[in-house]
């Protein structure tokens, strides 16, 4: 979409939350808005900005109008370790979670000072629902605030603590005042739910996904979210060695805090499948340090040389999932990962950890019927993982993965066919003339009309 010359170019200001699952789709939304002719400014902190600077630099070089405003993060003032600006930079406990939310609330004043100086004047705020003070910014400047939700539920289960009650109340209050909501999904995926939600929100709901598909450039795919901890060449070299649909990709998200004993059980389950695998583990946490000791002592990587690849830290997930050799995805059912799996037509084995992930699992396994559940019923509580210990036995892990990867079974074939069909629908949705493309156009037109009314 290219805006007509006589139409004022709208200026959207985006406020992503300080967690990878929130930042990544918001950056994609920024690119989509700019591709439709809008001016976009993103407010974030220095270390979070560094994760997508190269992606944005390429976007700007291509002619997109995207600007970046960096807010100094008050780590020390909030009682956080120096340099901690994201949920994935630290072992999460309930106290740490409270401190991170508190730090975000402290950004209000500096953000307001910089927002007031923006030129051209902003016409709309798109804010993560976890940043309620953006509602006050919108009211001050008499512009709409559109809420961005990563999750299906309004408040993640892990946040239902008394000390976080004040934050939750502020979020709910801001939601009541929001002009509308932008969602990373496509209408055809969950049509009934979308239609009902539109009625609830007075039709101010815009489904613009799968937003990950805005990344056409290979480097944009490889560096989406962060620079990978493994070279794409090494990753592709491993994948190229294996037959189509023969490798299972295992990633339980950037906030996976499973007990070390459970991670060992996962390793054993993977090994017993005899199926080639890529396994992504968090780097630098206490849990993974214990896992690393076990991996070294037991010579796990040597035992699985050529068949298994462990990626420590950030992985180029889009590059991996879209490779022909990937035949299944063991996922925590975070919405971004779920939608990325759907986008490339890969069936899933589901291992939800907390929050909306249990709802997403039901969508994948019971509604869309493109996944197999590992049968997890226990919600992971941050800081209490060791008390839970082993929730899923290696036998269940092996069974679910083998079920998903089986190409001879009729049920597995049907699952794979459904996943492939949804992938094609998702790709069409974001292309010109598709439902998500049209929704992005309608959103921009809505803001332009509001802008015109305000000026007249």
Where are the model-predicted features located?
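Glycosyltransferase specificity loop/lid
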Residues: 1-247, 251-456
């Amino acid at each position: 979409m290219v805006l007509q010359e006589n139409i004022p170019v709208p200026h959207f200001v985006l406020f992503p939350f300080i967690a990878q699952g929130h930042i990544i789709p918001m950056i994609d939304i920024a690119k989509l808005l700019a591709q439709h002719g809008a001016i976009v400014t993103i407010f974030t902190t220095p270390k979070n900005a560094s994760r997508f600077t190269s992606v944005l630099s390429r976007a700007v070089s291509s002619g997109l109008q995207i600007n970046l405003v960096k807010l100094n993060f008050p780590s020390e003032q909030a009682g956080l370790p120096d340099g901690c600006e994201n949920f994935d930079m630290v072992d999460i406990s309930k106290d740490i979670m409270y401190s991170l939310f508190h730090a975000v609330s402290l950004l209000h004043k500096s953000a307001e000072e910089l927002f007031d100086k923006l030129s051209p004047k902003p016409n709309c705020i798109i804010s993560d629902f976890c940043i309620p003070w953006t509602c006050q910014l919108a009211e001050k400047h008499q512009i709409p605030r559109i809420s961005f939700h990563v999750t299906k539920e309004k408040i993640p289960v892990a946040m239902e603590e008394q000390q976080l009650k004040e934050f939750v109340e502020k979020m709910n209050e801001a939601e009541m005042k929001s002009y509308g909501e932008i969602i990373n999904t496509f209408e055809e995926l969950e049509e009934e739910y979308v239609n009902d939600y539109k009625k609830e929100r007075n039709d101010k709901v815009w489904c613009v996904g799968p937003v990950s598909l805005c990344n056409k450039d290979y480097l944009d795919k490889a560096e989406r979210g962060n620079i990978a901890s493994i070279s794409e060449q090494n990753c592709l070299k491993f994948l190229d060695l294996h037959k189509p649909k023969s490798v299972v990709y295992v990633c339980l998200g950037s906030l996976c805090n499973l007990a070390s004993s459970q991670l060992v059980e996962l390793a054993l389950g993977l090994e017993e499948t005899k199926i080639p695998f890529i396994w992504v583990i968090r780097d630098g946490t206490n849990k993974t340090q214990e896992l690393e000791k076990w991996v070294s002592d037991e010579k796990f990587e040597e035992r699985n040389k050529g068949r298994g690849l462990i990626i420590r830290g950030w992985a180029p997930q889009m590059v991996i999932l879209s490779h022909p050799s990937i035949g299944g995805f063991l996922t925590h059912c975070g919405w971004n990962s779920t939608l990325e799996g759907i986008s490339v037509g890969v069936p899933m084995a589901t291992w939800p950890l907390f929050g909306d992930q249990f709802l997403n699992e039901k969508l994948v396994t019971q509604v869309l019927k493109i996944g197999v559940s590992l049968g997890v019923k226990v919600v992971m509580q941050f800081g209490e993982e060791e008390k839970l210990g082993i929730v899923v036995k290696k036998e269940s892990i092996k069974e679910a993965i083998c079920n998903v990867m089986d190409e001879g079974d009729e049920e597995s074939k049907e699952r794979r066919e459904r996943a492939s069909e949804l992938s094609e629908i998702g790709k069409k949705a974001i292309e010109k003339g598709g439902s998500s493309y049209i929704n992005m156009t309608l959103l921009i037109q809505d803001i332009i009309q509001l802008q015109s009314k305000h000026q007249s």
